[in-house]
Every structure is written in C-alpha cells, then in structure tokens.
Amino acid sequence: MEQNDIFALASKAMEEKQAVKESEKTCIIVGEKGSGKSTLVSALTNEEVKGERKPTAGIDFKYSAKKVEAKKVVGNFHEIGGGRFLSDLLQTVLNSSKLKDAVVIIAIDMSQPDTALYHLDFWLKKIRNVVDKAIQQLEKDNPEAASKVLSQSGYKWEGHTDGRRVFPIPIQTIIVGTKYDVFGIEESENKKWMCRALRFFAHTNG
C-alpha cells in the first residue's frame, strides 16, 4: 500500500469519527409496584428476559447505545422500584444537572382501572414537585440553563386556545398504559372514559 493511500484512509476515518456525534439522554421510569416498569425498560433496551422477574428494589440502572442515522444515542435508564413508598428516590436521579436531557416515563397499570388515575395524579404531582426544586437549584447555579429548560416547556402553548388551562411540566413526561391486554376486555364505554381521562391528564400537564 502506498503512503498516500495510508494517509487517505486515515483522513477518511477521522472524518467519519467526527461526523458521528453522540447524544446522551437520561430516562427515568416511575410507577406503582407491579405496574410493568421492568418490562418496559427491557423493551426499550432490547433486553432478552429470562426466567421470572423479581421486584425492583430501589433504583435499577441499565445502559443502551444505538446509532440513529449518523448520531450515536446513549440512553441511561433509571427504574425506580417500590412504588410511592420509595418515590423520594426520584430526586436522586432527577437533579439540576440532568434536567436538560431528562425524560420521565410514568407506567400506569391499565389492568387496575379503578386506581389508575389516582396513581397517575400522584406521579404527575411528584414529578412536578421534584422538577420545580431542581429548577430552583439550577437558577442559582446556571440561570441561563434554567431559563432554557423553562422556555422549552412552554413555548408551544403560546397563543394556543388552551394556553391558560395547561400547566406543562418543564421536562418531557410520557404516560404509558401497561397491561393493555387485560384492560382491553373492559366494556367499550369504560375504555372510552378512561382514555378521555388519560388524554385530559396528558394535555393539562403539557
């Protein structure tokens, strides 16, 4: 191989390396005991489940990396076990340094429709409270970063007809209904009202 070929290959490799940008995200999964959080994490990380699952105690961490187009996306998944009894653990992983790239997923057990909305309301309020405290700390440490987080959450509602009725949680929050196969056997009228209620909670929280 000629010397020029070596330099050409080295140059091409360097260009390709620079072209592949890395993006890192933090995903926090919360919900009641037995709501399907671990199953959800396994699906998100393409983890093969072997044997019977054991209840998650405390915080369980998993890591996943995927290439999306020319970008390497790194996902840090934190599952908070123990339900609301250990809900205060949320503030240990959702702190001021993680707000910019954090996503929270609330797993709602749809096989328990009588309590699903009650649990959803609890977790939405818990997340809002933790995020508000983290933003207060961020405003002290980095006012510019805090302003950016807040602006991202509210800009899309400017001029919207429901703008005064919506109070968005400052970070991306996703509601996932689990065990829908069980919920699916409910009467159609019950499913209709439950879905309307879930949309209402999702809409009013941004």
Whereabouts are the PLM-identified features?
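Structural beta-sheet core signal
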Residues: I29, I106, I175-G177
